[in-house]
Amino acid sequence: MTKDSIKFVDTYHKKFFVADYDYFYDKFDVRVSFDCVEKIITNAFFDFQDCAGLGKEKKYKLDKTELGYELSTVEERAISRKIKKFYKKKRKNKDFMLVLQRILIDPEYFRPVKVSVEDLDEDMSVSVNYGAFKQFSEKNFPEKIVFQLAVGNNKTSLELKFLKIDFDVPLEPNFKISPKFKRIE
């Protein structure tokens, strides 16, 4: 991951992915930036609407649960032309969608342990789950991050496991992609 692109190689399945951040807008109508992805991966507090560049000030409802503190907000969001085409295929005519965002905060570390966004009218959601916190370079960090995307009965997940993490180290990506690998679209 660099400031201008995301690259990863799945050596087990012999696949690779390379794209700039506009890929997510072009494909899913979601604006994502390097700063947003960095916050998600480093387990910092983030808000999907801020990541999308909307930057609206919002009010959160706070609840104390047995798992921690839950912040939630519901807002009406205008639908772009791309998403309107999706709804028209489903024979629905919508101009707005209701979006519910929930953030579960761990009471011990005061860090997110789960962040989810749901379209309340449709069966669509995305979530990020952080688990197995442990010490890396004297910093508490999740050993595992699970991303889940659900659209109806189609569910996709990606699990990241961290074995070693070094902080504040200059880094330069230096991997090569074999010509035998298939590109993930």
Residue ranges and their predicted role:
Residues 23, 28, 36-47, 59, ...:
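Structural signature for solvent-exposed beta-strand/loop edge elements and short helix-capping sites
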Residues 61-179:
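Gly/Pro-enriched, hydrophobic low-complexity segments
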